Regions:
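Extreme N-terminal tail/first-helix region
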Residues: 25-64
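Short helix-to-loop capping/linker segments positioned immediately adjacent to catalytic or ligand/cofactor-binding
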Residues: 58-60, 78, 155-160
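Short gly/pro-enriched beta-turn/loop segments at secondary-structure junctions
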Residues: 64-66, 165
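Short, structured beta-strand-loop surface elements
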Residues: 101-169, 174-175
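Extreme N-terminal basic, low-complexity initiation segments
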Residues: 2-11
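Short beta-strand segments
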Residues: 66-102
Length: 177
């Protein structure tokens, strides 16, 4: 077993995290390293957010080459404003995000935030705009998942690991001006 961060890395976790928690997953997910490594994933997210904003939407390793959107949302339970960096793909003018949690058996916290409070603020590169998170279903969900998995093949593994959970897919629709 290897202890690693979750969240924006999209890696499966055994439990949801709070600052200082350690995340556990099998080394079969292609991670290199020693026996264990304790990582505060909220601190990792904060670092990625700062790097994103300092570099006009670009992030270095381990996110280099992955399209990242910063999504500011309202917490379902806390009512607080929260920001999560998420991998995305596009479909027409919309962004698409997948609540894979790296193939974990449960949905990420941001999934519950989107369901409770679908109005969000997106940061893509240097562009900021309001959007609505729309949960997709059926053929549309399947098509969008397949399209993102074609761009980021690790999502195929996430679907296998999550089974029988069907991983939710959200369309982020720009709000009308």
């Amino acid at each position: 077993m290897l202890l690693v961060p979750a969240g924006i890395l999209g890696l499966p976790v055994c439990r949801t995290g709070r600052r200082g928690d350690v995340f556990v997953l099998p080394t079969s997910f292609g991670l290199a390293g020693g026996d264990t490594m304790a990582v505060d994933f909220l601190a990792l997210n904060e670092k990625a957010i700062a790097e994103f904003r300092a570099n006009e939407g670009e992030c270095g390793p381990p996110f280099e080459g992955t399209p990242i959107v910063l999504v500011t949302m309202v917490g379902a339970k806390s009512g607080r404003e929260l920001c999560s960096p998420l991998a995305y793909s596009t479909d027409d003018d919309d962004l698409v995000v997948i609540a894979s949690m790296g193939g974990a058996p449960n949905n990420p916290n941001w999934y519950h935030n989107f369901v409770a409070n679908p109005d969000v603020l997106l940061e893509v590169g240097t562009d900021q705009y309001e959007a609505t998170a729309v949960l997709t279903e059926g053929e549309e969900r399947d098509r969008l998942y397949a399209a993102q998995a074609a761009q980021l093949p690790v999502f195929n593994k996430y679907a296998e690991n999550a089974a029988p959970r069907v991983i939710p897919v959200f369309r982020l629709v720009r709000a009308s001006s």
